[in-house]
Amino acid sequence: MSYKAKLSDDAKKDIKEFNPAQQRQITSAIQKVSINPLPQNEGGLGKPLGNKQGKNLTGLCKIVLMKLGVRIVYKLIRTETVMEIIVIAARADDEVYDIANKRNQ
């Protein structure tokens, strides 16, 4: 089941930090995953997150763009079939998980 991808206000700011070519790649990846954003353990394309360095990220999933060095963290709002993008950031250590933890509270 396809979900509607929605960027949070913070994620809209995040994506502007990338150049136009990178923005197209990020948008394309989000659109691809939005076709089936469920966690992989439910047959979807999302990589589920759990506890990362003491941060409870249960219920969140990630998309990894290896060549760009970018992680996209999102949560599903199943009742509305919405895939809400919380963070779009470089894969600098686990910084993206720190940001996701703060924004998800």
Feature map (PLM): residue ranges:
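Residue-level marker for the onset of beta-strands and adjacent loop->beta junctions
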Residues: 1, 59, 70-72
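Arg/Lys-rich, positively charged N-terminal/basic patches that mediate binding to nucleic acids
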Residues: 1-32
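Enriched for short, Lys/Arg-rich terminal
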Residues: 13, 64-105
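A short, surface-exposed loop/turn module that caps and links secondary-structure elements
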Residues: 35-64
